[in-house]
Amino acid sequence: RETAPKGANPDMWDVDKKGEVISDDKEFGGKSIGVPGSVKGFLYVLEKYGNLDRKAVIQPAIDLANNGYRVSAIMNMDMKNQMNNILKYPATAKIYLKNGKPYNVGDLLKNPDLAKTMEKIVKDGEKAFYEGEVAEAIVKATVAAKGKMTLEDLKNYKIKISDPVKGTYRGYEIYTAAPPSSGGAHIIQILNILENYDMKNIPAGSARYYHLLSESMKMAFADRAKFMGDTDFIKIPL
């Protein structure tokens, strides 16, 4: 997964008296961008465990980006909800807006620049993304948005192999992503709370069902806010 750029530090955020970040910089803009790990991670898994080559795996996505795909109702809603943020970044607006407005449901959306990037990855592997033209474009855009990423950050990115988090639910073993990903551990926590109730006989969609689910999630998210983090730096009571 992504990592913080080497130049990231607590002082880059504006915080209030409680230590909470005042602006939305932690969600949008250059400061919120980590050094991307997906490309290197996916290629590692493909090489170690796969039996297809890069072209066979990536070509369908290239075709989709070049030929386009139909905008769904959910995507249309997301475009409308994020209009203000999309408009801040011309390159993003060029892709996800049509004449300055969200694409309509059913419109064809193409992303040829993404296709070109994936074609480079097919040809040259991870180096095509973490060095050279693509890396330079990533850093340029990030720095322009007040981010901290450098070419060195990209070139030096290393994947980390972690043991999965393991839990149980009604006799089933569950294996899921380890921290700093928070979803896995807290999904197990939520399930462990819910297994104290006879969920099988509580109608899905009923008030009782949603009440138990929301209360379980509330407790999990409270623990997430208090304890979750990166195990390279803190100890987490898993």
Where are these regions (language model features)?
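A structural signal for alpha-helix termini and helix-coil/disorder junctions
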Residues: 48, 67, 120, 144, ...
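Noncatalytic scaffold domains of N-terminal-nucleophile
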Residues: 1-131, 135-178, 182
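Internal maturation/activation junctions in enzymes
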Residues: 197-238
